[in-house]
Protein backbone atom coordinates (compact mmCIF):
# COMPACT_ATOMS: atom_id res chain seq x y z
CA UNK A 1 0.00 0.00 0.00
CA UNK A 2 1.39 3.37 -0.97
CA UNK A 3 1.46 6.39 1.30
CA UNK A 4 -1.07 8.09 -0.92
CA UNK A 5 -3.48 5.16 -0.57
CA UNK A 6 -3.15 5.27 3.19
CA UNK A 7 -3.93 8.91 3.32
CA UNK A 8 -7.07 8.34 1.28
CA UNK A 9 -8.24 5.64 3.65
CA UNK A 10 -7.83 7.93 6.64
CA UNK A 11 -9.76 10.79 5.04
CA UNK A 12 -12.85 11.69 7.24
CA UNK A 13 -16.31 10.90 5.86
CA UNK A 14 -18.29 13.81 4.49
CA UNK A 15 -22.04 14.25 5.08
CA UNK A 16 -24.14 12.86 2.27
CA UNK A 17 -26.14 15.48 0.36
CA UNK A 18 -29.32 15.23 -1.66
CA UNK A 19 -28.63 15.16 -5.37
CA UNK A 20 -30.80 15.54 -8.42
CA UNK A 21 -31.03 11.78 -8.81
CA UNK A 22 -33.18 11.60 -5.64
CA UNK A 23 -30.70 10.01 -3.20
CA UNK A 24 -32.10 9.84 0.33
CA UNK A 25 -30.11 11.90 2.85
CA UNK A 26 -28.51 10.33 5.87
CA UNK A 27 -30.60 12.67 8.12
CA UNK A 28 -33.87 10.94 7.15
CA UNK A 29 -34.58 9.55 10.60
CA UNK A 30 -33.97 12.90 12.22
CA UNK A 31 -36.26 14.67 9.73
CA UNK A 32 -39.07 12.15 10.31
CA UNK A 33 -38.75 12.63 14.03
CA UNK A 34 -38.97 16.41 13.63
CA UNK A 35 -42.05 16.01 11.44
CA UNK A 36 -43.74 13.80 14.02
CA UNK A 37 -42.97 16.32 16.74
CA UNK A 38 -44.44 19.12 14.61
CA UNK A 39 -47.61 17.16 13.84
CA UNK A 40 -48.08 16.17 17.45
CA UNK A 41 -47.54 19.75 18.60
CA UNK A 42 -50.02 21.03 16.00
CA UNK A 43 -52.61 18.40 17.01
CA UNK A 44 -52.26 19.24 20.69
CA UNK A 45 -52.60 22.93 19.92
CA UNK A 46 -55.70 22.30 17.79
CA UNK A 47 -57.30 20.19 20.53
CA UNK A 48 -56.44 22.77 23.18
CA UNK A 49 -58.20 25.42 21.10
CA UNK A 50 -61.13 23.23 20.00
CA UNK A 51 -62.16 22.11 23.49
CA UNK A 52 -62.78 25.61 24.92
CA UNK A 53 -64.32 26.69 21.60
CA UNK A 54 -66.73 23.75 21.69
CA UNK A 55 -67.47 24.47 25.31
CA UNK A 56 -68.21 28.10 24.50
CA UNK A 57 -70.51 27.03 21.66
CA UNK A 58 -72.39 24.72 24.02
CA UNK A 59 -72.95 27.64 26.36
CA UNK A 60 -74.24 29.88 23.57
CA UNK A 61 -78.00 30.09 23.33
CA UNK A 62 -79.53 28.87 20.08
CA UNK A 63 -82.29 31.06 18.62
CA UNK A 64 -84.34 27.94 17.83
CA UNK A 65 -85.65 24.94 19.73
CA UNK A 66 -85.95 22.49 16.83
CA UNK A 67 -88.49 19.68 16.79
CA UNK A 68 -87.43 16.31 15.41
CA UNK A 69 -89.50 14.84 12.61
CA UNK A 70 -88.89 12.84 9.47
CA UNK A 71 -89.93 12.95 5.84
CA UNK A 72 -90.81 10.15 3.53
CA UNK A 73 -88.33 9.63 0.73
CA UNK A 74 -88.96 12.42 -1.83
CA UNK A 75 -90.69 11.39 -5.05
CA UNK A 76 -88.33 10.41 -7.84
CA UNK A 77 -87.95 13.24 -10.33
CA UNK A 78 -88.91 11.44 -13.51
CA UNK A 79 -91.94 11.55 -15.79
CA UNK A 80 -93.81 14.83 -15.29
CA UNK A 81 -91.31 15.78 -12.56
CA UNK A 82 -88.23 15.24 -14.72
CA UNK A 83 -85.88 18.26 -14.48
CA UNK A 84 -85.98 20.67 -17.42
CA UNK A 85 -85.13 24.29 -18.17
CA UNK A 86 -88.56 25.59 -19.15
CA UNK A 87 -88.52 28.43 -16.64
CA UNK A 88 -85.43 29.83 -18.35
CA UNK A 89 -87.65 30.80 -21.27
CA UNK A 90 -89.21 33.48 -19.05
CA UNK A 91 -88.33 37.14 -19.43
CA UNK A 92 -87.54 39.42 -16.52
CA UNK A 93 -89.72 42.50 -16.09
CA UNK A 94 -88.93 45.65 -14.09
CA UNK A 95 -85.49 44.26 -13.24
CA UNK A 96 -83.82 46.14 -10.37
CA UNK A 97 -86.94 48.30 -10.03
CA UNK A 98 -88.86 46.00 -7.67
CA UNK A 99 -87.80 44.36 -4.44
CA UNK A 100 -89.28 40.99 -3.53
CA UNK A 101 -92.59 41.08 -5.47
CA UNK A 102 -93.97 38.03 -3.63
CA UNK A 103 -97.55 37.90 -4.95
CA UNK A 104 -99.15 39.20 -8.15
CA UNK A 105 -102.73 39.90 -9.18
CA UNK A 106 -104.39 41.56 -12.15
CA UNK A 107 -107.45 43.74 -12.64
CA UNK A 108 -107.94 43.66 -16.39
CA UNK A 109 -104.46 43.97 -17.86
CA UNK A 110 -103.08 45.98 -14.96
CA UNK A 111 -100.86 44.10 -12.52
CA UNK A 112 -100.45 44.76 -8.81
CA UNK A 113 -97.90 43.45 -6.32
CA UNK A 114 -96.42 44.14 -2.90
CA UNK A 115 -92.74 44.80 -2.36
CA UNK A 116 -90.11 44.37 0.36
CA UNK A 117 -89.94 48.14 0.91
CA UNK A 118 -93.50 48.14 2.21
CA UNK A 119 -95.38 49.30 -0.89
CA UNK A 120 -98.33 48.05 -2.91
CA UNK A 121 -97.63 49.05 -6.51
CA UNK A 122 -99.42 49.16 -9.85
CA UNK A 123 -97.57 47.90 -12.94
CA UNK A 124 -98.95 49.34 -16.18
CA UNK A 125 -97.35 50.19 -19.53
CA UNK A 126 -93.87 49.64 -18.15
CA UNK A 127 -94.44 52.08 -15.29
CA UNK A 128 -94.46 51.47 -11.53
CA UNK A 129 -96.81 53.50 -9.37
CA UNK A 130 -97.21 53.26 -5.60
CA UNK A 131 -100.86 53.05 -4.57
CA UNK A 132 -100.61 52.11 -0.89
CA UNK A 133 -98.28 51.73 2.06
CA UNK A 134 -99.26 50.19 5.40
CA UNK A 135 -96.21 51.13 7.46
CA UNK A 136 -93.61 53.86 7.55
CA UNK A 137 -89.92 54.15 6.78
CA UNK A 138 -87.09 53.53 6.91
CA UNK A 139 -87.32 50.32 4.90
CA UNK A 140 -83.70 49.30 4.32
CA UNK A 141 -82.86 46.39 6.62
CA UNK A 142 -84.55 43.37 8.17
CA UNK A 143 -84.77 45.29 11.44
CA UNK A 144 -86.98 47.85 9.69
CA UNK A 145 -89.58 45.31 8.52
CA UNK A 146 -92.00 45.47 11.48
CA UNK A 147 -92.43 49.25 11.18
CA UNK A 148 -92.06 49.41 7.40
CA UNK A 149 -94.53 46.60 6.77
CA UNK A 150 -94.25 43.77 4.25
CA UNK A 151 -97.20 43.24 1.86
CA UNK A 152 -97.41 39.57 0.87
CA UNK A 153 -100.56 37.90 -0.51
CA UNK A 154 -102.70 40.08 -2.78
CA UNK A 155 -106.10 39.38 -4.40
CA UNK A 156 -108.69 41.23 -6.45
CA UNK A 157 -112.10 41.78 -4.89
CA UNK A 158 -115.47 41.92 -6.69
CA UNK A 159 -115.72 45.72 -6.74
CA UNK A 160 -112.37 46.66 -8.24
CA UNK A 161 -110.63 46.76 -4.88
CA UNK A 162 -107.65 44.77 -3.67
CA UNK A 163 -107.41 42.64 -0.57
CA UNK A 164 -103.86 42.52 0.80
CA UNK A 165 -102.22 40.91 3.81
CA UNK A 166 -99.20 42.54 5.39
CA UNK A 167 -96.98 40.17 7.36
CA UNK A 168 -96.75 42.62 10.27
CA UNK A 169 -99.80 44.84 9.99
CA UNK A 170 -102.76 42.59 9.19
CA UNK A 171 -105.52 42.43 6.57
CA UNK A 172 -106.34 45.44 4.35
CA UNK A 173 -108.64 46.53 1.54
CA UNK A 174 -107.11 48.93 -0.98
CA UNK A 175 -108.93 51.04 -3.56
CA UNK A 176 -106.38 51.45 -6.39
CA UNK A 177 -108.34 54.27 -8.01
CA UNK A 178 -108.71 56.42 -4.91
CA UNK A 179 -105.42 55.27 -3.33
CA UNK A 180 -107.38 54.65 -0.14
CA UNK A 181 -106.56 52.02 2.49
CA UNK A 182 -108.96 50.36 4.92
CA UNK A 183 -107.72 48.20 7.79
CA UNK A 184 -109.98 45.16 8.12
CA UNK A 185 -108.12 43.22 10.80
CA UNK A 186 -105.05 44.32 12.73
CA UNK A 187 -102.33 41.80 13.48
CA UNK A 188 -102.43 43.18 17.03
CA UNK A 189 -105.88 41.63 17.49
CA UNK A 190 -105.59 38.31 19.38
CA UNK A 191 -107.43 35.46 17.69
CA UNK A 192 -108.59 32.89 20.23
CA UNK A 193 -105.94 34.12 22.63
CA UNK A 194 -103.02 34.10 20.18
CA UNK A 195 -101.45 37.00 18.35
CA UNK A 196 -100.71 36.96 14.65
CA UNK A 197 -96.98 37.36 14.02
CA UNK A 198 -96.71 36.36 10.37
CA UNK A 199 -99.80 37.01 8.22
CA UNK A 200 -98.94 35.42 4.90
CA UNK A 201 -101.49 34.76 2.14
CA UNK A 202 -105.20 35.00 1.44
CA UNK A 203 -107.99 33.89 -0.87
CA UNK A 204 -111.37 35.58 -1.29
CA UNK A 205 -114.84 34.34 -2.23
CA UNK A 206 -116.31 35.71 -5.45
CA UNK A 207 -118.81 37.88 -3.58
CA UNK A 208 -116.03 39.28 -1.39
CA UNK A 209 -117.68 38.28 1.87
CA UNK A 210 -115.32 35.61 3.17
CA UNK A 211 -111.54 35.92 3.29
CA UNK A 212 -109.45 32.88 4.15
CA UNK A 213 -105.90 33.65 5.22
CA UNK A 214 -102.87 32.14 6.91
CA UNK A 215 -100.98 33.21 9.99
CA UNK A 216 -97.75 31.28 9.59
CA UNK A 217 -96.72 31.55 13.24
CA UNK A 218 -97.61 33.24 16.49
CA UNK A 219 -93.93 33.07 17.51
CA UNK A 220 -91.84 33.90 14.44
CA UNK A 221 -92.08 36.94 12.19
CA UNK A 222 -91.59 36.98 8.44
CA UNK A 223 -87.99 38.19 8.75
CA UNK A 224 -87.24 34.95 10.64
CA UNK A 225 -88.90 32.58 8.16
CA UNK A 226 -85.82 30.34 7.97
CA UNK A 227 -85.86 29.90 11.76
CA UNK A 228 -89.54 28.97 11.49
CA UNK A 229 -88.72 26.30 8.90
CA UNK A 230 -85.74 24.92 10.81
CA UNK A 231 -87.52 24.83 14.15
CA UNK A 232 -90.58 23.14 12.58
CA UNK A 233 -92.83 25.17 14.84
CA UNK A 234 -96.44 23.96 14.67
CA UNK A 235 -98.22 27.13 15.76
CA UNK A 236 -99.55 28.24 12.36
CA UNK A 237 -103.25 28.64 11.55
CA UNK A 238 -105.76 28.93 8.75
CA UNK A 239 -108.35 31.62 9.56
CA UNK A 240 -111.62 32.92 8.14
CA UNK A 241 -112.63 36.59 8.20
CA UNK A 242 -116.21 37.69 7.47
CA UNK A 243 -116.21 41.17 5.90
CA UNK A 244 -119.84 41.73 6.93
CA UNK A 245 -119.91 40.53 10.55
CA UNK A 246 -116.18 41.25 11.14
CA UNK A 247 -115.92 37.87 12.87
CA UNK A 248 -112.73 35.79 12.74
CA UNK A 249 -112.62 32.00 13.08
CA UNK A 250 -109.77 29.52 13.34
CA UNK A 251 -110.45 26.78 10.79
CA UNK A 252 -107.30 24.73 11.33
CA UNK A 253 -104.41 25.09 13.76
CA UNK A 254 -101.16 23.33 14.72
CA UNK A 255 -99.86 23.82 11.20
CA UNK A 256 -96.14 23.90 10.39
CA UNK A 257 -95.59 27.08 8.38
CA UNK A 258 -98.97 27.42 6.63
CA UNK A 259 -98.29 29.53 3.58
CA UNK A 260 -100.21 29.91 0.31
CA UNK A 261 -104.00 29.42 0.20
CA UNK A 262 -106.50 28.95 -2.62
CA UNK A 263 -110.27 28.44 -2.79
CA UNK A 264 -111.60 25.71 -5.05
CA UNK A 265 -113.64 26.81 -8.11
CA UNK A 266 -116.84 25.70 -6.32
CA UNK A 267 -115.67 27.44 -3.12
CA UNK A 268 -116.33 24.32 -1.07
CA UNK A 269 -112.77 23.88 0.17
CA UNK A 270 -109.56 25.82 0.72
CA UNK A 271 -106.12 24.50 -0.08
CA UNK A 272 -103.34 25.50 2.29
CA UNK A 273 -99.64 24.88 1.68
CA UNK A 274 -97.83 23.56 4.75
CA UNK A 275 -94.34 24.56 3.73
CA UNK A 276 -92.21 22.89 6.40
CA UNK A 277 -93.85 19.52 5.75
CA UNK A 278 -93.76 19.74 1.92
CA UNK A 279 -97.49 19.13 1.56
CA UNK A 280 -100.85 20.76 0.81
CA UNK A 281 -103.90 20.28 3.02
CA UNK A 282 -107.55 20.62 2.04
CA UNK A 283 -110.02 22.24 4.44
CA UNK A 284 -113.74 22.04 3.66
CA UNK A 285 -115.59 25.32 4.22
CA UNK A 286 -119.05 24.52 2.80
CA UNK A 287 -121.20 21.57 1.81
CA UNK A 288 -121.62 18.20 3.50
CA UNK A 289 -117.96 17.97 4.51
CA UNK A 290 -117.79 21.44 6.05
CA UNK A 291 -115.44 21.49 9.02
CA UNK A 292 -113.44 18.51 7.82
CA UNK A 293 -109.90 18.40 6.50
CA UNK A 294 -107.70 15.96 4.62
CA UNK A 295 -104.47 15.76 2.66
CA UNK A 296 -104.57 17.09 -0.92
CA UNK A 297 -100.92 16.56 -1.93
CA UNK A 298 -98.37 14.84 0.29
CA UNK A 299 -94.61 14.37 0.02
CA UNK A 300 -94.05 17.02 -2.63
CA UNK A 301 -90.76 17.38 -4.56
CA UNK A 302 -90.36 20.92 -3.22
CA UNK A 303 -91.43 23.11 -0.31
CA UNK A 304 -94.64 24.83 -1.48
CA UNK A 305 -95.27 28.56 -1.27
CA UNK A 306 -98.26 30.24 -2.92
CA UNK A 307 -101.05 28.37 -4.71
CA UNK A 308 -103.00 29.93 -7.58
CA UNK A 309 -105.62 28.59 -10.04
CA UNK A 310 -104.66 27.33 -13.48
CA UNK A 311 -106.84 27.73 -16.56
CA UNK A 312 -107.09 23.94 -16.85
CA UNK A 313 -109.04 23.69 -13.61
CA UNK A 314 -106.04 22.77 -11.48
CA UNK A 315 -103.54 24.80 -9.51
CA UNK A 316 -100.10 26.34 -9.90
CA UNK A 317 -97.79 25.77 -6.94
CA UNK A 318 -94.46 27.58 -6.59
CA UNK A 319 -91.48 26.12 -4.71
CA UNK A 320 -88.22 28.01 -4.20
CA UNK A 321 -86.45 25.00 -2.69
CA UNK A 322 -86.64 21.42 -3.91
CA UNK A 323 -86.20 17.95 -2.42
CA UNK A 324 -84.05 16.41 -5.12
CA UNK A 325 -84.32 12.67 -5.68
CA UNK A 326 -81.85 11.56 -6.83
CA UNK A 327 -79.83 14.21 -5.05
CA UNK A 328 -79.46 15.79 -1.63
CA UNK A 329 -81.92 17.90 0.35
CA UNK A 330 -80.43 19.78 3.28
CA UNK A 331 -83.84 20.23 4.93
CA UNK A 332 -84.64 16.52 4.65
CA UNK A 333 -81.23 15.62 6.07
CA UNK A 334 -81.57 17.98 9.04
CA UNK A 335 -85.22 17.23 9.84
CA UNK A 336 -84.45 14.61 12.52
CA UNK A 337 -81.20 16.19 13.74
CA UNK A 338 -82.21 18.99 16.14
CA UNK A 339 -78.75 19.13 17.76
CA UNK A 340 -77.09 19.95 14.43
CA UNK A 341 -79.72 22.58 13.66
CA UNK A 342 -79.10 24.22 17.03
CA UNK A 343 -75.37 24.31 16.39
CA UNK A 344 -75.80 25.74 12.88
CA UNK A 345 -77.77 28.71 14.13
CA UNK A 346 -75.43 29.25 17.05
CA UNK A 347 -72.64 29.80 14.53
CA UNK A 348 -74.32 31.31 11.47
CA UNK A 349 -76.93 33.93 10.63
CA UNK A 350 -79.98 33.22 8.47
CA UNK A 351 -78.41 35.08 5.57
CA UNK A 352 -75.29 32.94 5.78
CA UNK A 353 -77.32 29.72 5.85
CA UNK A 354 -79.38 30.91 2.87
CA UNK A 355 -76.19 31.02 0.80
CA UNK A 356 -75.99 27.23 1.07
CA UNK A 357 -79.57 26.70 -0.14
CA UNK A 358 -79.57 25.81 -3.87
CA UNK A 359 -81.25 28.43 -6.06
CA UNK A 360 -83.48 25.87 -7.73
CA UNK A 361 -86.86 27.26 -8.83
CA UNK A 362 -89.76 24.88 -9.41
CA UNK A 363 -93.35 25.50 -10.50
CA UNK A 364 -95.81 22.60 -10.41
CA UNK A 365 -99.20 22.32 -12.06
CA UNK A 366 -101.43 20.12 -9.93
CA UNK A 367 -104.77 18.69 -11.06
CA UNK A 368 -108.04 19.18 -9.18
CA UNK A 369 -107.45 15.75 -7.62
CA UNK A 370 -103.92 16.53 -6.44
CA UNK A 371 -101.97 14.72 -9.18
CA UNK A 372 -98.90 16.32 -10.74
CA UNK A 373 -99.68 17.42 -14.30
CA UNK A 374 -96.40 19.07 -15.26
CA UNK A 375 -93.38 20.77 -13.80
CA UNK A 376 -91.35 23.79 -14.86
CA UNK A 377 -87.76 24.10 -13.67
CA UNK A 378 -84.81 26.46 -13.51
CA UNK A 379 -82.26 24.14 -11.86
CA UNK A 380 -79.72 26.78 -10.90
CA UNK A 381 -81.81 29.94 -10.93
CA UNK A 382 -80.31 31.41 -14.08
CA UNK A 383 -83.49 33.35 -14.89
CA UNK A 384 -86.10 32.60 -12.22
CA UNK A 385 -84.86 32.79 -8.64
CA UNK A 386 -86.56 32.40 -5.25
CA UNK A 387 -89.93 31.85 -6.92
CA UNK A 388 -92.91 32.36 -4.60
CA UNK A 389 -95.95 32.40 -6.90
CA UNK A 390 -97.15 31.59 -10.41
CA UNK A 391 -100.09 33.80 -11.42
CA UNK A 392 -101.74 32.93 -14.73
CA UNK A 393 -103.19 35.69 -16.90
CA UNK A 394 -103.94 35.87 -20.62
CA UNK A 395 -101.68 33.00 -21.69
CA UNK A 396 -98.76 33.94 -19.46
CA UNK A 397 -97.44 32.92 -16.08
CA UNK A 398 -96.30 35.87 -14.00
CA UNK A 399 -93.77 34.65 -11.48
CA UNK A 400 -93.35 36.39 -8.14
CA UNK A 401 -90.36 36.16 -5.83
CA UNK A 402 -89.83 36.80 -2.13
CA UNK A 403 -86.24 38.03 -2.70
CA UNK A 404 -85.52 38.83 -6.34
CA UNK A 405 -85.58 42.42 -7.74
CA UNK A 406 -87.93 41.57 -10.62
CA UNK A 407 -90.93 39.56 -11.74
CA UNK A 408 -90.79 37.07 -14.59
CA UNK A 409 -93.23 36.44 -17.43
CA UNK A 410 -93.44 33.06 -19.14
CA UNK A 411 -95.51 32.36 -22.26
CA UNK A 412 -97.45 29.14 -21.74
CA UNK A 413 -97.51 28.59 -25.50
CA UNK A 414 -93.71 28.36 -25.55
CA UNK A 415 -93.63 25.41 -23.17
Swiss-Prot record:
Keyword match Magnesium: no
Transmembrane segments: 40-60
Pfam (any one): SSL_N
Any single GO CC term annotated in Swiss-Prot or TrEMBL for this entry: cell surface
PTM annotation (Phosphothreonine): residues: 19
Region of interest: Disordered: 1-29
Glycan attachment residues as annotated in the record: 159
Chief localization: membrane
UniProtKB keywords: Acetylation, Glycoprotein, Membrane, Phosphoprotein, Signal-anchor, Transmembrane, Transmembrane helix
Subcellular location(s) of the protein: Membrane
Post-translational modification as stated in the protein's UniProt record: Glycosylated in vitro.
Ranges of the Extracellular topological domain: 61-415
InterPro entries: 6-blade_b-propeller_TolB-like (IPR011042), Strictosidine_synth_cons-reg (IPR018119)
Chain positions with N-acetylserine modification: 2
Topology of this chain in the membrane: Single-pass type II membrane protein
Tissues where the protein occurs: Strongly expressed in adipose tissue. Highly expressed in liver, heart, and kidney. Expressed at intermediate level in brain and lung. Weakly expressed in spleen, skeletal muscle and testis.
Keyword Membrane: yes
Molecular function in Gene Ontology: arylesterase activity
Cytoplasmic compartment residues: 2-39
Job of this protein: Exhibits strong arylesterase activity with beta-naphthyl acetate and phenyl acetate. May play a role in adipocyte differentiation.
Family, as annotated: Belongs to the strictosidine synthase family.
The protein's name in its UniProt record: Adipocyte plasma membrane-associated protein
Species, as recorded: Mus musculus
Name of encoding gene: Apmap
Amino acid sequence: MSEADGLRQRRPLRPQVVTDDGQVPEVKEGSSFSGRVFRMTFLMLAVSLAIPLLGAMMLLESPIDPQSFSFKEPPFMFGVLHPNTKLRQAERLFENQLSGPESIVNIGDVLFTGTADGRVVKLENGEIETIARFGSGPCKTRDDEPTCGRPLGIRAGPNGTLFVVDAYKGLFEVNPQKRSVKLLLSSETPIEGKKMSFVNDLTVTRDGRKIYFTDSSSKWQRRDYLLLVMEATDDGRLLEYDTVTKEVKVLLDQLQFPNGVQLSPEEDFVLVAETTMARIRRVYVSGLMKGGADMFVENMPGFPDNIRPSSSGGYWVAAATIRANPGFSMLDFLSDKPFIKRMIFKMFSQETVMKFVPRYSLVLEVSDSGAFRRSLHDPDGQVVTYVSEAHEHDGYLYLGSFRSPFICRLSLQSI
